[in-house]
Amino acid sequence: MEFRRILVPVVGTEADDEAIRLACRLAKKDKGKIWAVSVITLSRTLPIEAELENEIKKAEAVLEHVETVAEEEDYEVETDLFQSREAGPTIIDEAVEREVDLILMGVTYKTRFGQFSLGTVIPHVLKNAPCRVILYHQIKAD
């Protein structure tokens, strides 16, 4: 399998770090390109062009950290920040626009009502992705 164009959505978890490391290893093999994207989701009560300074600063810090992790792997990552109502459709739109071969996502151990949960973004991406998807699952901390 060749992965020349890899999209890595990030939110700032340890699983993101490992997903970026894995993306770098996969991309190196084929001299591929990696895009790390962060999506700020806006409440429907706010206008889509609303500027949430704190959220933007957090997302920019996450993207800067991702660049550092990639540098540790001796690879370069291009980063982008988006604002939208829902992260899932934005990730899919970017995957289509960039014609990626792979979406690689870090998954943390989350529970909802006492059960393990993937949330809403990951199922949306799995259902609608125009390419392969790899989930990197972070081990549950005890």
Show where each model-derived region lies:
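A short acidic, glycine-rich active-site loop
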Residues: 51-61
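Glycine-rich, Arg-bearing micro-motifs that act as flexible, cationic patches
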Residues: 105-128, 142
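Short, flexible loop segments at boundaries between secondary-structure elements
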Residues: 131-142
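Active-site phosphate/pyrophosphate- and oxyanion-stabilizing loops and adjacent acidic/basic residues
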Residues: 24, 92, 123
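Small/aliphatic-rich secondary-structure junction motif
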Residues: 1-50, 71-73, 78
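Short secondary-structure boundary segments
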Residues: 38-39, 106-108, 137-138
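Structural beta-alpha unit
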Residues: 1, 71-103, 142
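Solvent-exposed polar/charged
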Residues: 28, 96-97, 127
